[in-house]
Amino acid sequence: MILKCIREEAGLNVRILKKEEEARATIDAFFFSSHDKLSLTKKKYIMVIDQGGGSTEVSLFKEGEYVSSYSINLGTEVLRTLLFKESTNQTTLRQALKMTDHLIKDRLEAFYKNMLANFESEEPIYTIAVGTAITKATGKKGNAKQHGTILSVDRIIEKIASLDDDLKKRYTYAGDLYHHVRHGGTRSDQVDGDVVMRVGLPMFVELMKKLGIEELTVSGTGLWYGIYSQNLYN
């Protein structure tokens, strides 16, 4: 009904992508924007962790062919909302962050139960990461500079610890942080970005540790790059 309305009122044809199509477009976007395409084609296993605002999609490719995808209904926007929504005036920021970390581990149990067998491999899994939290974690500004940055699991853990220290020094209670971000306090945009990183990055760490992945490569390209490349070359 909505798609029909858009077509009739705006004259635009809109198509909703299936999981496989979205995963393929995401990986095509990464390839399209990467310099060392030959090296990438030699990777036997490639995993894409695409963390959006509402969910996180984990997709696996083997020798260039799509294997499977799994959607974890936790994204950075959901986690940020829960960080504040589940807190009271007496909830410390430490307690609130511990809650979101626990929630990630809890939701990942279903992923492990349903999908872990697909990801078990003696060969290393080349991992591509997409999303605001992971691109911000590069410490670089602009998608072009962020694209292709390699982050080790240890470096991501260090980033989480650094964010923890900074946020907890400045805000004792979760409500204090919420008030600052919501009402546009000093550097509120930067603080909000730190919150997004802090709640989003543990998802990558948990997946990397469980699957034995030592490092990942950040993609600074959007899904539309993949759609464009598919239409350009097909």
Task: Kindly give the residue locations of the regions a language model identified.
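Helical "lid/coupling" subdomains associated with nucleotide-phosphate turnover
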Residues: 1-45, 60-62, 67-234
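Active-site-adjacent helix-turn-beta-strand microarchitecture at beta-sheet edges
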Residues: 52-58
